[in-house]
Amino acid sequence: MNSAGYEVFEVLSGQSFRCAEGQSVLRAMEAQGKRCIPVGCRGGGCGLCRVRVLSGAYRSGRMSRGHVPAKAAAEALALACQVFPQTDLTIEYFRHVGGNKPDNMNYEEVTS
């Protein structure tokens, strides 16, 4: 257990913030006034806060398989509202392209 929390770095925005033990990446970002990931339902259902974890260990909460299919989760895609760091993390915000079909695995990096 790390009482000081973990550093989370979002590569596209260049922003970083601290995430307390047991706190989701999205809640930590909001609490510190950062805006590198869009905020939606905060409960794993809308898919708006989709990220790819580039490095670090984390625990995932419940996420809609309509937004993060098992194959995508295996490729380190997750919803920031359901990502709970266990080490420092490097993440990248991603947007889904082509609708919300679980079998549609087209993702694109958002650079704007």
Swiss-Prot record:
PROSITE patterns: 2FE2S_FER_1, 2FE2S_FER_2
InterPro entries reported for this sequence: 2Fe-2S_ferredoxin-like_sf (IPR036010), 2Fe-2S_ferredoxin-type (IPR001041), 2Fe2S_fd_BS (IPR006058), Beta-grasp_dom_sf (IPR012675)
One example of a Gene Ontology biological process annotation: catechol-containing compound catabolic process
Keywords on record: 2Fe-2S, Aromatic hydrocarbons catabolism, Electron transport, Iron, Iron-sulfur, Metal-binding, Plasmid, Transport
Binding annotation for [2Fe-2S] cluster: C41, C46, C49, C81
Family matches, as Gene3D superfamilies: 3.10.20.30
SUPFAM superfamilies hit by this protein: 2Fe-2S ferredoxin-like (SSF54292)
Recorded superkingdom: Bacteria
Domain 2Fe-2S ferredoxin-type residue range list: 6-97
Keyword Metal-binding in annotation: yes
Gene Ontology molecular functions: 2 iron, 2 sulfur cluster binding; metal ion binding
UniProt pathway: Aromatic compound metabolism; catechol degradation
Annotated coiled-coil segments of the chain: none
Family, per entry: Belongs to the 2Fe2S plant-type ferredoxin family.
Reported function: Ferredoxins are iron-sulfur proteins that transfer electrons in a wide variety of metabolic reactions.
Listed name of the protein: Ferredoxin, plant-type
Source species: Pseudomonas putida (Arthrobacter siderocapsulatus)
Lineage start: Bacteria, Pseudomonadati, Pseudomonadota, Gammaproteobacteria, Pseudomonadales
